[in-house]
Amino acid sequence: MTYTTFSKNKNNQLYEPMFFGQSVNISRYDQQKYEIFEKLIEKQLSFFWRPEEVDLSRDYIDFQNLPQHEKHIFVSNLKYQTLLDSIQGRSPNIALLPIVSLPELETWIETWSFSETIHSRSYTHIIRNIINTPSLIFDDIIDNKNIANRAKDIAKYYDDLIELTSYWHLFGEGKHTINGKKIKIDLHELKKKLYLCLISVNALEAIRFYVSFACSFAFAEREKMEGNAKIIRLIARDEALHLTSTQHILNILHNDKNNEGMSDISKECYEECYHLFIRVSDQEKIWAKYLFQNGSMLGLNQEILSQYIEYITNIRMKAIGLPSPFKILSNPIPWINSWLISDNVQVAPQEISVSSYLIGQINSEINDSDFEKFKL
């Protein structure tokens, strides 16, 4: 099936599946097959924020006074989050847009990816405000084995889908020899690649960020690195929306009544999906061990974080129809909910700047040239 950015075939988009139907031609929103994506778009747009709105001048002082093992925890999490959102800032567009068939879903994917680029910019904003040589941090991301090992697992499902989709668009279904390699291209296998990719993305949004989130909020609970925590809180709000979107996509695919042609695929991939979540959970526990290898921080340690990972893994798997693999039933760090559920938080403005408002709109930098027009 040859891909075109604008199909001249007139069609009724209400009868198209989410994926692998006719590519979107007219981006129209007066009629929608799945209104949830329009609601997600509107919500994400209402969330719009910029990292520069948050003043990090106090965080610089806080960071200098952290013990070395806490600096390791803080910086390592920023490195990992930078990697995750570097992938998420581009991959949904590259992997999903060429096969999407609904305008509301197409626009949601673009809106989602754009918000991820704001997250990437945020980590740069944080790093260059607390560290004199930011390149030392960014240059280590690729070289750090603890980060790189997880990157392979994250990118694999995207890459597999992108590769097979490219072949499908160029050569169509059938058996082909490409660069001396025999490849079978069929829609069933392509749908399977898509489904596993969506499960992988869901696991990423559902679990992979939350060790870093917990650490950032634990610092702020001690009134340390509070500017960073305000930014991470905004990121966490976005990620919760992205998680909701992937859960909706998957549950729509699961429902036979929607005629998406994917319910058999979900059953076929059931075991692999279950073990994918377990693997992600195990990787995050290993990451927690790496973070706390030189010491714990007040209110948080490797054991507590591992329990929290199991707790949220149970919830996330249940949300998409998978059984809960762990026995833990209660949240071992309930205080984190006040950071993740923004409506729970009321902050006195005189005590600390409020992250629910646009802040830092005034440029606080003053140079000698700013006083040239002043007369005494």
UniProtKB/Swiss-Prot annotation:
GO terms for biological process: deoxyribonucleotide biosynthetic process. The active site is at Y123. Its EC number is 1.17.4.1. Fe cation 2 binds at E116, E205, E239, H242. SUPFAM superfamilies: Ferritin-like. The keyword Oxidoreductase applies. The keyword Metal-binding applies. Binds 2 iron ions per subunit. Keywords: Deoxyribonucleotide synthesis, Iron, Metal-binding, Oxidoreductase. Fe cation 1 binds at D85, E116, H119. It comes from the Bacteria. It catalyses: a 2'-deoxyribonucleoside 5'-diphosphate + [thioredoxin]-disulfide + H2O = a ribonucleoside 5'-diphosphate + [thioredoxin]-dithiol. PANTHER family: RIBONUCLEOSIDE-DIPHOSPHATE REDUCTASE SMALL CHAIN, RIBONUCLEOSIDE-DIPHOSPHATE REDUCTASE SUBUNIT M2. Tetramer of two alpha and two beta subunits. This is Ribonucleoside-diphosphate reductase subunit beta.
